[in-house]
Amino acid sequence: MKFSSVLALAASAKLVASHATVFAVWINDEDQGLGNTADGYIRTPPNNSPVTDVTSTDLTCNVNGDQAAAKTLEVAAGDKITFEWHHNSRDSSDDIIADSHKGPVLVYMAPTEAGSAGKNWVKIYEDGYNDGTWAVDTLIANKGKHSVTVPDVPAGNYLFRPEIIALHEGNREGGAQLYMECVQFKVTSDGTTQLPEGVSLPGAYTATDEGILFDIYSSFDSYPIPGPAVWDGASSGSGSSGSGSSSSAAATSSAEKTATSTTAAATTTAVATSTSSATQVQPTSVATFTTSVRPTTSAAPTTSAPTSSAAPTGGTGTGSIQIYQQCGGMNYKGATGCASGLTCKQWNPYYHQCVQA
């Protein structure tokens, strides 16, 4: 097999070992139980593979995201919503997402009907790159949790869309990996702050946006978070706190958004003080996520072969690693031996992968 074909196949395999989805939600620090089950409240995809085509309708709420979940959680303005991400299971040993998957964490919201159609998405939270720390690093440190505060919007049904953009392959067009789900909420308080028009998803990103096509292995001091500015009517949880201590995050327009990844400060908006009436859903078992490869209809990128096939660095374990699994890279601690007929290729300093020899 030609090396270019191997590279294309590896790109479509999505580096399946290190992905993540939202497993659960907390409201005002109360666990709402597993939401990614058949009777849950998250529009959960069939696997934890990322979306890499920013023009795909899967960018709205992921695969099957147009299908409503069984339940809807109730919240009120001022309530704190905490999203909890995991790789394979809601277990203390879960690695959340590979630490090589550097990138920003964002949250959008939209009225349910419009949001399901990919329209009127309003960004209410973002965290990117601050003083050498990526939002994904903070997410892992906080055991997969990040928080937002429910704005003082009119009563009704809304979708909240947490998102991770992993940039470990963002140095090539089509390499960024986007992870998102839509969580169903009913806002019971009746606020007077109307959501602005919002953006379309897909539509808000392009494959060549500075924050999508971004080389994390180059020298840089700041990172331009993709998409619109954070709505100035949003009051979102701090990006540095897993418990989601409340702080305001906003900007007045997309044009005023700077290339730094710090969350823009703005005057805190007033929120109602009513408390959540969410029905608590207790998990009956710990769900696990089976990682699989989702085929895509878009053409695989044609990329020149790496100039070096350096031996894996950082791996200390031994074992027989299967095709497309990680076998090395900076800070990698797992096994480094590929199965028979495979070789460990270096795609970048942080990620080496078993591919056909």
UniProtKB/Swiss-Prot annotation:
CC terms in the record's Gene Ontology section: extracellular region
Recorded catalytic activity of this chain's protein: [(1->4)-beta-D-glucosyl]n+m + reduced acceptor + O2 = 4-dehydro-beta-D-glucosyl-[(1->4)-beta-D-glucosyl]n-1 + [(1->4)-beta-D-glucosyl]m + acceptor + H2O
Domain (CBM1): residue spans on this chain: 319-355
Binding site residues for Cu(2+): H19, H101, Y179
Binding, O2: H168, Q177
Record's signal peptide: 1-18
Cysteine pairings via disulfide bonds: C61-C182
EC top class named in words: oxidoreductase
Domain of life per record: Eukaryota
Protein induction: Expression is induced by cellulose and xylan. Expression is also induced on lignocellulose, such as steam-exploded sugarcane bagasse (SCB). The degenerate binding motif 5'-SYGGRG-3' that binds to creA involved in carbon catabolite repression is present in the promoter.
Cofactor names: Cu(2+)
Ranges for region Disordered: 292-317
UniProt region (Ser/Thr-rich linker), positions on chain: 235-318
Protein name: AA9 family lytic polysaccharide monooxygenase B
UniProt EC number: 1.14.99.56
UniProt note: domains: Has a modular structure: an endo-beta-1,4-glucanase catalytic module at the N-terminus, a linker rich in serines and threonines, and a C-terminal carbohydrate-binding module (CBM). The genes for catalytic modules and CBMs seem to have evolved separately and have been linked by gene fusion.
Function text: Lytic polysaccharide monooxygenase (LPMO) that depolymerizes crystalline and amorphous polysaccharides via the oxidation of scissile alpha- or beta-(1-4)-glycosidic bonds, yielding C4 oxidation products. Catalysis by LPMOs requires the reduction of the active-site copper from Cu(II) to Cu(I) by a reducing agent and H(2)O(2) or O(2) as a cosubstrate. Active on carboxymethylcellulose (CMC), hydroxyethylcellulose (HEC) and beta-glucan. Also active on soluble cellohexaose, a property that is restricted to only a few characterized LPMOs.
